[in-house]
């Protein structure tokens, strides 16, 4: 290239720019760069040679020849100089040309370093991918395979590829990697980025060639490289987001999810397989034609390697020869396939479903298809699977007994019970709806009558009562509606004590004289309500408790001080309030004869537990505490669980308690005559045992008289209430029994607990001749 030639082109361009001004400026720029384009064209041949070699040869050539570089599109643009720089070169501006050359050399050095770093990065990436492909385990490859299937599922939803988990995994990887092998599957361009990550260890050489071609194509066009890097970044970001969502929420629920652990996966595939009779030749091209002709058809690929209908997970990496079966089912989706499988399980339509396919295929293919269908739903119903082996090599044939029923007796019973339940429920629903319709129809008629009455000028009822003899229509008042009174009548018959029935009947009686029906029904209600009340009173036993103690004292007797107020001394102290003896506090009891002491506590107070735990020697126990009583004193004993003391036994002790009370006066304790020897052996209940204390002025009384008045007893027993006729429930009822005594002189008294001598302590249940004591009250009155 000479500078003179450049000057001539400069003059031509300047004159041309002056004539055409700014309109033809772009065309002149092209003429100015003509020489540079020639240089670029001469270097394109070298670029093609360099691209045909691998990346390692390129680095060696560049290091050996410092001035020669492989020029891609980006490098060609670097050699293009601007117009002012070109004019300076033409005008022999040596200084500018030298500076430009220096800048150009610096740029070349920087680009050389950049290319070297890029080449090193690519080599590192290749080595890293190569090592990962060698060291990756089987589970990682399986996960990548599932990702590809999930990616293909989003693109094609009408293609179902049903295979055994491990066999389809090995076969599909060999199809995707070995593109030169016959019977391959064509990977679309959208899946090349994912296919590069799925390389088995046995195919390392082919993975290297694949990566070298990728790097060579990447070095050809840097602009395309930038765009592809951006697309790769977006794919990585999208993949990470997708992975996070799947880790948190799980895989999306689609038709390929497993129903059972043994159910095969329904994976959506991008590629279609060819027909069964093509003998595995030109699979991809033939199936593309099929897709163009029949766009609505679905292709099912069924590969099976079963051992007695049990999926084997052994020898995953062993490349075994497995025949591939193709079945075309028109107008089906995954749900239809599952429905057909369920029909096969019941043994109803399986022969008609696969009839055409069985006529075209050989026995091996038929066995292979049946085994895969059994794996979809691994329930064997009358199948002869005696000769089925691991690899389905032998020509075994599975016979189906269509004459036999596939339903078990349990299934028949459940089916019959379900039918009975459905029939009963449908019958009830039909009758309920029929009754509802009748009620609805009745009220609609009433509403229509009300509307006609409102629209008519006079309140004339549409339904007129006719007299048979006279055939005279009687007008009825619209407000004379006895429906509410009728409802009240039927509700009153249900109630046991119909107070509201009577009140409602009286209220409805207060109606105008024209409302004859309402009045008649109100009178009927009142009459029956009164009858029900009378019947209720006569048949009901009202249980009125007898008062514990009730004494009426005349005012003059109190004024005369005949019965002065009582005094209660306890532990040498006078108590104006009452004393309570129960299980809330600890009390001591001693034997009447041996003076042995027994203690009572919570849940062990004068009951069956107390006797079975303490087992006293005597049948009479006295309180260890002495209570000094004077004047009017009230003593009350509350009995718990136990029977009443029989009337026959009461007759035996009745003479000791006759003629003690005069009218409503207190019982004078001095009149009591019962002693320790008079107490019967079979008595059970409580008692008050008192002994008189002699003061100094009574010392003149002789000793026989003192011995005669030594102790006096008054007994308390559980008795039936006067107004209570429920004798059966008295066993569990707590009944208080009390009496008011008058002590003229001071007595030392003890509370007594009595039970029969013949009682058994080890008896579990409460005996019939025993009663518990819950509480004892002593109160000055």
Curated annotation (Swiss-Prot):
Compositionally biased residues, Acidic residues: 1-12
Keyword tags: Membrane, Merozoite, Transmembrane, Transmembrane helix
Region annotation (Disordered) ranges: 1-29, 45-66, 91-130
GO CC annotation, single: cytoplasm
Membrane topology: Multi-pass membrane protein
Biased composition (Basic residues): 101-114
Highest taxon listed in the record's lineage: Eukaryota
Low complexity: bias regions: 91-100
Applied biotechnology: Possible candidate for an effective malaria vaccine as determined by epitope response in sera.
Transmembrane regions listed in the UniProt entry: 487-507, 520-540
Location in or out of the cell: Membrane
Extent of Basic and acidic residues compositional bias: 115-129
Protein name: Uncharacterized protein PF3D7_1205000
């Amino acid at each position: 290239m000479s500078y003179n030639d450049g000057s001539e082109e400069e003059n031509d361009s300047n004159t041309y720019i002056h004539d055409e001004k700014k309109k033809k400026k772009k065309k002149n720029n092209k003429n100015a760069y003509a020489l540079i384009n020639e240089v670029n064209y001469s270097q394109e041949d070298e670029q093609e040679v360099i691209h045909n070699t691998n990346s390692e040869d390129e680095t060696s050539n560049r290091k050996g020849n410092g001035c020669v570089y492989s020029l891609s599109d980006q490098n060609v643009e670097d050699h293009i100089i601007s117009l002012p720089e070109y004019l300076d070169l033409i005008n022999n501006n040596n200084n500018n040309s030298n500076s430009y050359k220096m800048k150009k050399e610096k740029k070349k050095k920087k680009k050389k370093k950049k290319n070297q770093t890029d080449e090193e990065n690519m080599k590192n990436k290749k080595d890293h991918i190569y090592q990962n492909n060698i060291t990756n385990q089987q589970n990682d490859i399986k996960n990548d395979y599932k990702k590809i299937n999930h990616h293909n599922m989003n693109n094609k939803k009408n293609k179902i590829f049903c295979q055994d988990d491990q066999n389809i995994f090995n076969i599909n990887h060999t199809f995707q990697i070995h593109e030169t092998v016959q019977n391959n599957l064509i990977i679309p361009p959208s899946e090349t980025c994912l296919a590069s990550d799925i390389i088995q260890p046995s195919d390392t050489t082919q993975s290297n060639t694949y990566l070298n071609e990728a790097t060579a194509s990447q070095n050809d066009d840097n602009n395309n490289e930038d765009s592809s890097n951006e697309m790769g970044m977006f794919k990585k970001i999208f993949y990470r987001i997708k992975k996070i969502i799947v880790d948190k929420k799980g895989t999306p629920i689609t038709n390929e999810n497993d129903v059972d652990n043994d159910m095969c996966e329904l994976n959506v595939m991008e590629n279609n397989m060819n027909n069964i009779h093509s003998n595995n030749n030109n699979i991809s091209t033939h199936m593309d034609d099929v897709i163009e002709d029949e766009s609505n058809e679905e292709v099912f690929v069924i590969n099976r390697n079963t051992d007695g209908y049990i999926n084997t997970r052994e020898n995953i990496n062993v490349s075994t020869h497995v025949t591939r079966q193709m079945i075309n089912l028109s107008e089906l989706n995954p749900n239809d396939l599952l429905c057909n499988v369920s029909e096969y399980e019941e043994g109803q339509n399986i022969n008609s479903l696969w009839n055409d396919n069985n006529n075209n295929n050989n026995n091996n293919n038929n066995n292979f298809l049946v085994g895969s269908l059994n794996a979809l739903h691994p329930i064997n119903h009358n199948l002869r699977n005696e000769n089925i082996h691991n690899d389905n090599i032998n020509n075994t044939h599975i016979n189906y007994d269509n004459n036999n029923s596939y339903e078990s007796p349990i299934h028949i019973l459940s089916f019959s019970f379900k039918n009975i339940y459905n029939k009963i429920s449908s019958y009830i629903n039909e009758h309920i709806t029929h009754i509802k319709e009748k009620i609805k129809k009745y009220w609609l008629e009433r509403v229509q009558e009300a509307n006609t009455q409102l629209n008519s000028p006079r309140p004339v009822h549409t339904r007129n009562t006719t007299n048979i003899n006279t055939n005279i229509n009687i007008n009825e008042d619209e407000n004379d509606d006895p429906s509410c009174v009728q409802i009240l009548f039927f509700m009153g018959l249900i109630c046991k004590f119909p107070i509201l029935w009577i009140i409602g009947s009286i209220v409805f009686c207060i109606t105008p004289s024209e409302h004859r029906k309402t009045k008649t029904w109100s009178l009927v209600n009142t009459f029956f309500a009164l009858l029900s009340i009378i019947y209720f009173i006569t048949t009901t036993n009202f249980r009125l408790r007898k008062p514990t103690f009730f004494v009426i004292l005349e005012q003059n007797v109190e004024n005369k001080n005949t019965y002065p107020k009582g005094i209660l001394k306890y532990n040498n102290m006078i108590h104006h309030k009452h004393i309570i003896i129960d299980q809330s506090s600890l009390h001591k009891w001693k034997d009447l004869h041996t003076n042995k002491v027994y203690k009572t506590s919570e849940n062990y107070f004068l009951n069956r537990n107390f006797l079975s735990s303490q087992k006293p020697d005597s049948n009479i126990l006295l309180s260890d505490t002495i209570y000094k009583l004077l004047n009017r004193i009230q003593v009350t004993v509350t009995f718990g669980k136990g029977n009443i003391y029989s009337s026959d036994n009461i007759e035996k002790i009745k003479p000791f308690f006759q003629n003690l009370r005069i009218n409503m006066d207190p019982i004078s304790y001095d009149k009591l005559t019962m002693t320790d020897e008079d107490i019967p052996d079979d008595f059970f209940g409580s008692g008050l045992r008192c002994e008189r204390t002699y003061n100094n002025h009574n010392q003149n009384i002789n000793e026989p008289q003192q011995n005669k008045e030594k102790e006096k007893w008054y007994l308390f027993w559980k008795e039936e209430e006067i107004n209570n006729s429920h004798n059966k429930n008295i066993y569990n009822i707590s009944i208080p029994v009390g009496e008011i005594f008058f002590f003229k002189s001071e007595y030392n008294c003890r509370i007594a607990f009595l039970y029969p001598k013949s009682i058994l302590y080890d008896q579990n249940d409460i005996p019939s001749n025993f009663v518990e004591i819950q509480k004892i009250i002593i109160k000055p009155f």
